[in-house]
Regions:
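AlphaC helix of the protein kinase catalytic domain
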Residues: 102-113
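Conserved short submotifs of the Hanks-type protein kinase catalytic core
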Residues: 87-101
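Activation segment
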Residues: 161-163
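Activation segment signature within eukaryotic-like protein kinase domains
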Residues: 121-122
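AlphaC helix of the eukaryotic protein kinase fold
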Residues: 47-69
Length: 209
């Protein structure tokens, strides 16, 4: 994979990797050219293996569209969906946050968090989910590693297993997530593990377990 995607985004450091792809800290060279003091973004690109899966680019676009549909202070901001013509790899650009994920915080605090601190996480997270559900979007994979805690507050991210309710984003193709079967044991609602459809209750389950 080239070090610069679409002639604009220079990959600098791997931030994390999952089943669909990897997330990098990247520099937006166009923003740098125009003297933007903060030219850094997060960039998620499909892995070489997953890029060969049918509908892989469409699944990534679905994640982008679902997240972009939500304009909420506690949902990670999406910027663009693009395809690099050299390596034919789809990617999305998004807000880069400084901080740690909730699972990293919990690893540092094995005895748990006091309610005073926990409520500052749980309340904005539930508010983000309530907003998403009201806008017809289901997250599908609520877990600590998909919650970022930073100086600018909490952000829910990674709608890769998300879905739009009927009538929401009608132009978005209905794609099956069955083949990636990425529900997280311990956070996935029992009905998801039984193969039942995703519902808002499954997102709430991921918060309370």
């Amino acid at each position: 994979m080239p070090s610069v995607l679409a002639g604009r985004y220079r990959l600098e450091r791997l931030l994390g990797a999952g089943g669909m792809g990897a997330v990098y800290r990247a520099k937006d060279l166009l923003r740098e050219q125009f003297a933007d003091p903060e030219p850094y973004i997060a960039l998620k690109v499909l892995s070489e293996a997953f890029a060969q899966v049918p509908d892989a680019s469409a699944l990534l676009y679905s994640e982008f569209a679902l997240t972009r549909h939500l304009r909420h202070d506690n949902v990670l901001r999406m910027y663009s969906f693009e395809v690099d013509t050299e390596c034919q790899r789809a990617f999305i650009t998004m807000e880069l946050m400084q901080g740690m994920t909730l699972d990293q915080l919990l690893c540092e605090r094995p005895l748990g968090l006091p309610w005073r601190e926990l409520r500052t996480i749980a309340l904005p997270l539930l508010d983000a989910l309530a907003y998403a559900h009201a806008r017809g979007v289901l997250h599908g994979d609520v877990k600590p590693s998909n919650v970022m805690l930073g100086d600018d507050g909490l952000r829910l991210f990674d709608f890769g297993l998300g879905q739009a309710k009927e009538g929401t984003l009608p132009g978005l193709p209905h794609l099956s997530r069955d083949r990636i079967n990425a529900w997280t044991p311990g956070y996935a609602a029992p009905e998801l593990l039984e193969g039942k459809p995703l519902a808002a209750s499954a997102d709430v389950y991921g918060v309370v377990v």
